[in-house]
Regions:
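Terminal single-pass membrane anchor helices
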Residues: 1-7
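Acidic/histidine-rich catalytic neighborhood of metal-dependent amide-processing enzymes
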Residues: 144-199
Length: 199
């Protein structure tokens, strides 16, 4: 029975996406990954995050909103085509679980995040679902909690797939859609992982 090695969502926020995942996947080796120059690359990432923020994913307690999140999944599929082409995808009532098959049988890694956001109340300097890119920032509900994490994980895997990289162990990407109200999204993912004998 394998156990999962968990990576908190915030780990990907301070470094370029692929560097984070490559560091985790090859912890005993010096990485030859060179962070790209800021500029076009940074703008590409900002535009992806902006598009994700513009798709409103507010979740409400005890309301079936799976269809809303299926729409958000289409945004992810368009932004990260290789992830959707190469990884095994499982959708559980709007919750996502991807499996990236590794070459060995070492302990799997699970990268966790969530797709949902809390309601946008009060006054905003920029409209909450505008995804405006201004003053060196992406503005809007979900930029830090936590679509930036979702984007970082997907972008990292997308870039590594483009390089032809295959991890030495299985890597899972899990993203629930009811985190903001402690709903049943994460427990459903856990149940699937138990079904796979991973926990």
């Amino acid at each position: 029975k394998k156990s999962l090695f968990l990576i908190p969502a915030a780990a990907a926020l301070s470094l370029p996406a692929a560097a984070v995942v490559r560091t985790v996947l090859t912890p005993n080796k010096r990485s030859d990954y060179a962070a790209p120059e800021a500029g076009d690359y940074a703008l590409e990432l900002a535009r992806k995050l902006s598009e994700m923020v513009r798709y409103e994913t507010v979740s409400h307690a005890n309301v079936d909103e799976a269809e809303k999140f299926l729409g958000f999944h289409k945004v992810l599929e368009r932004l990260f085509p290789l992830v959707h082409e190469k990884l095994e995808k499982t959708v559980i009532d709007g919750n996502l679980l991807f499996k990236w098959k590794g070459t060995g049988d070492g302990m799997p890694i699970l990268l966790m995040s969530h797709q949902d956001v809390v309601p946008a109340e009060g006054k905003w300097e920029h409209e909450p679902f505008s995804g405006d890119i201004a003053d060196g920032k992406v503005w809007g509900r979900g930029t830090s909690d936590t679509k930036a994490s979702v984007m970082a994980f997907f972008q990292a895997v997308e870039e590594l797939l483009k390089e032809g990289y295959t991890p030495k162990c299985d890597v899972y990407l899990a993203s629930s859609c009811t985190e903001e109200w402690a709903g049943d999204g994460a427990p459903k993912i856990v149940k699937e992982l138990q079904h796979l004998s991973l926990i």
